[in-house]
Regions:
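N-terminal auxiliary segments of SAM/dcSAM-dependent transferases
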Residues: 1-33, 44
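Class I S-adenosyl-L-methionine
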Residues: 10-24, 180-213
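Class I SAM-dependent methyltransferase Rossmann-like catalytic core
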Residues: 42-50
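Conserved SAM/SAH cofactor-binding pocket of Class I
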Residues: 53-134, 140-143
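Short beta->alpha hinge that forms the Motif I/post-I loop of the SAM-binding pocket
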Residues: 103-107, 153, 176
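A short SAM/SAH-binding and catalytic strip from SAM-dependent methyltransferases
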Residues: 139-152
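A short glycine-rich, Lys/Arg-flanked "PGG" loop and its adjoining helix->strand segment in the class I
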Residues: 155-167
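Conserved beta-strand signature within the Rossmann-like core of class I S-adenosyl-L-methionine
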Residues: 168-175
């Protein structure tokens, strides 16, 4: 694991399974062409102070991006969902699809489900990674992946979930350019997932990842 990267066992860190940090709830809004959402977040959850810059950039870009059509009844996923800003946006944008919001962090999962209920979204399923039915094939994945878990763990995570995309599926990721966005793009392309940068803004890259199976 890279130097100065917190250990996944750190009880205060967002990728801990059961963070022990005292609860400090905060509310924030997510606005876009698909409407306005009101969410809560908490200590021990990714972006505990509100909507983080990377996710904000990602949602702005994706609101205008011409994505391939998604068939009603499809499964979509947000890996590392945190409090649910991306997953809830997907649920609003694709009301006829089922959105899997996936996170190792139980506090994040609880808050994400609470946020979905609060916003009247019934097409979100919140799960820990190991709880997701391995037979499910996803039409698309949107994610602000947990870069700080370390390069090797991140590669393992992405390799696992990219393999679960449909044969014509697409993943969209946002990655800080100073935390390896370009090298990650090259790695995914070398892994036979052709990756294109569709936007670069405020220090973040938004990547489109295709399947070639």
């Amino acid at each position: 694991m890279p130097k100065n990267t917190p250990s996944p066992s750190d009880p205060q860190h967002y990728f801990s399974e059961s963070p022990q940090a005292p609860s400090r709830r905060k509310e924030f809004a997510v606005s876009g062409t698909d409407g306005k959402l009101t969410l809560s977040t908490d200590a021990g959850v990714f972006s505990q102070h509100g909507l983080d810059k990377g996710t904000s950039v990602f949602l702005e870009v994706m609101a205008k991006h011409d994505c391939a059509p998604i068939e009603p009844g499809s499964f979509l996923c947000d890996i590392g969902c945190g409090s649910g800003a991306i997953a809830l946006t997907l649920a609003v944008r694709y009301p006829a699809c089922t959105i899997y919001a996936v996170d190792t962090n139980k506090r994040a999962r609880d808050i994400c489900l609470e946020n979905a209920t609060r916003n009247g979204l019934t097409n979100i399923v919140v799960k820990a990674p190991e709880e997701v039915d391995p037979s499910i094939v996803f039409a698309s994945m949107w994610s602000n992946p947990p870069i700080r878990i370390g390069k090797s763990a991140l590669h393992d995570l992405l390799e696992l979930w990219l393999a679960r995309l449909d044969t014509d599926g697409t993943a969209y990721l946002v990655v800080n350019k100073n935390l390896g966005a370009d090298s990650l793009s090259q790695w995914m392309t070398a892994l036979s997932y052709p990756t294109t940068r569709i936007a670069s803004r405020n220090g973040f890259r938004v990547l489109e990842v295709k399947t070639t199976r």
